[in-house]
Structures are given as C-alpha cells and as structure tokens.
Amino acid sequence: MKEIYFGGGCFWGIEKYFQLIKGVKKTSVGYLNSRIRNPSYEQVCSGYTNAVEAVKVEYEEKEISLSELIEALFEVIDPTIRNRQGNDIGTQYRTGIYWTDSSDEKIINDKFLKLQKNYSKPIVTENKKVENYYLAEEYHQDYLKKNPNGYCHIKFD
C-alpha cells in the first residue's frame, strides 16, 4: 500500500472524489506542512499556519498508479491558479501533491511536464515533501458522506 497527499481546494470534495476511484483504499483529511503543531481549522483558515487542506490517499499500486491519480486530480482542479479553487480563496486552498517516498517526486515532476501542454498558463501546483500532517477535526472526516448537500466546488452529478 502506498500513500500520497493531495491539496485541491476544500478537502471535503477532494476526499469524496478520491474515495470514488478504484484502487484507493483509505482516505483522511488534515492539515499538511503546518508551521505549528496540531493546528485547528480556525488557525488554518487564519493563514497563520501556512498549512494546506490536504487529503491523505492510501492506494494499491497494482490497481492504480500515481500517474493516474495525478491525472484524476487535474480533472477537478485548475492547476494554474494559486491559493484558490472555486469559491475557496486562501493559502490553505492551494493545490499540491505531497509525498513521503522520495521516488514519487520525479514521477510527479515528469507528469507535470507532460500535463503542462494542456494549459496556456504555467502549472503552479506544488510538488513537495510531507513535513507534517495533522488529522483534521472529526466533523471534517467524510464530511460529504455525513452532509450530502454540503458545499463543494466539485460537481458530482
């Protein structure tokens, strides 16, 4: 089982989206690469922590590759916009792919180079090592399962 972390705006929709993908075995939402230990949602929203709202995705490599997961992410984000997705604006909503296995860095870089041809503006999605990851509060976990009519910048129709 491998793990990768995705930032793509509000983590509620990104989590639901990846839960629907074959080969993804487990997800959680949290705050990634924070300046402070165990930040609260309010602290993250203030911008002080510089944390990203992120989804930890655990997946079976025999069923889906990292390259395919990146393509899936790019289906629901605009990788050319910094600190915003949909109506969500702030540094916590920046897009990124974050890794714990250093061999993933090259896969991500290579994929960005291939995908760049699809965009007239440069891709600004981050490709960085996970420095820390703190689980978000319980009410954020599986939010759109618990609240099917909740706000989401991703359309699931």
Swiss-Prot record:
Enzymatic reactions: L-methionyl-[protein] + [thioredoxin]-disulfide + H2O = L-methionyl-(S)-S-oxide-[protein] + [thioredoxin]-dithiol; [thioredoxin]-disulfide + L-methionine + H2O = L-methionine (S)-S-oxide + [thioredoxin]-dithiol
Catalytic site positions: C10
MF GO annotations: L-methionine-(S)-S-oxide reductase activity; peptide-methionine (S)-S-oxide reductase activity
GO biological process, one term: cellular response to oxidative stress
Domain of life according to the entry: Bacteria
Entry keyword annotation includes Oxidoreductase: yes
Keywords, sorted A to Z: Oxidoreductase
Family assignment from sequence similarity: Belongs to the MsrA Met sulfoxide reductase family.
Protein's UniProt name: Peptide methionine sulfoxide reductase MsrA
